[in-house]
Amino acid sequence: SAAQNLSPAYPRRAAWGTAGSLRAWQAAALGQYLETMPQDFLAVATPGAGKTTFALRVATELLSSGDVHKVTIVCPTEHLKYQWAEAAARVGIHIDPSYSNSQGALGSRFDGVALTYAQVAANANLHRARTDQARTLVILDEIHHGGDALSWGDAIREAFTPARRRLALTGTPFRSDTSPI
């Protein structure tokens, strides 16, 4: 698949196309994921270790097998939405980074959307309805931000409880306050 050509640490480390295979942790985690096919999976790796590459590899596997039909990526900032969409496009996954809550329906040319945590919190019911409409993989990037505002954590639960699969990513699997991740 196209994901096999994705640099293990895209976009920040290895130059595009220079890394021919997954890093050891990515390969081990992918094997565990595909063997167990969990509804929820947490990948913890240091910044720059290749969490994006790992998540997109999982997404390509699940999409190509038909296990999921749509992908939703949730991240902390607008800028990251566009980074995710660009990385996903390189492996053949078409993500709409400019999707807005006022749009409602997603264009048929897209395999999914990229959202911010604040965007989900602003209309959790909309995102739950979208998640209910198709077998969806939800990638929660920098999931430790899910506890930044109580409403964000509540909205994540409300919007994505019906997801077929949820893949949480973090380089910081803890918080300095009492909010849960």
Descriptions of predicted regions:
Residues 52-57, 67-90:
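Conserved Walker A/P-loop ATP-binding site and its immediately adjacent core
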